[in-house]
Amino acid sequence: MHRQLRYAVLATALFASTAFAGARQELDTFTRGLKGLDGQFSQRVTDANGRVKETSSGRVALATPRQFRWEYAKPYKQLIVADGKKVWVFDPDLEQVTVRAQGSEEQNSPLVALIDPALLDKKYDVSEEAAPRDGLQWLSLTPKVDTDASFQIASLGFGREGLARMEVVDAVGQRTAIGFSGWKRNPAFAADTFRYTPAKGVDVVGDAQ
């Protein structure tokens, strides 16, 4: 997966609960009063034939409204920051940052609907898997309008500590599986967590104004 396009898939993460009820009930319970999350992730991307294309890991932070930070540590460093208006994608090895306005990728992702639960049933057909899988309770989200989303289906797996895994299948059958751990609910984020200021010498591509 192209490094600067990963945010479109990664934006489909989040928000869980610690109960043993069904996945939908867990989601509804946990989103009450939820303003942000901070934790670690590991990602595995496979093609339609199951061949591994990419593995990566790092740290993720999310907050309302429409703010997120994906900080990749392995296999190479990369930082993706959204401040609610713009998305910044910084590649340290290239000394380059690409910036663009936040648009339909975020507006039509489960992330927005999960932060604002009122949008969940409006944008997606929501269903629970009948039985646990891999020890998790699963909630499936299928976009009601195909052209409004970058994926065919997203599945959220809930365990004892909340959202443990997310699986996303795109239009060509590529599957992205993300495991989450160490969630901190409503943490006190540093002031610059969801802001990016290019350092001296970094090339800026796009509209930073």
UniProtKB/Swiss-Prot annotation:
A Pfam family recorded for this sequence: LolA
> What are the recorded Gene Ontology BP terms?
lipoprotein localization to outer membrane; lipoprotein transport
Which residue stretches, if any, does this entry annotate as coiled coil?
none
GO CC terms of this entry: outer membrane-bounded periplasmic space
Protein's cellular compartments: Periplasm
Question: Residue span of the signal peptide, if any?
Answer: 1-21
Keyword annotations of the record: Chaperone, Periplasm, Protein transport, Signal, Transport
Q: Which HAMAP family match?
A: LolA (MF_00240)
Q: What PANTHER family does the database record attribute to this sequence?
A: OUTER-MEMBRANE LIPOPROTEIN CARRIER PROTEIN
Q: Which family does it belong to?
A: Belongs to the LolA family.
Q: How does it assemble?
A: Monomer.
Functional summary from the UniProt entry:
Participates in the translocation of lipoproteins from the inner membrane to the outer membrane. Only forms a complex with a lipoprotein if the residue after the N-terminal Cys is not an aspartate (The Asp acts as a targeting signal to indicate that the lipoprotein should stay in the inner membrane).
Q: What is the protein name stated in its UniProt record? A: Outer-membrane lipoprotein carrier protein
Gene source species: Xanthomonas axonopodis pv. citri (strain 306)
Organism classification, top ranks? Answer: Bacteria, Pseudomonadati, Pseudomonadota, Gammaproteobacteria, Lysobacterales
Task: Name the encoding gene, please.
Answer: lolA
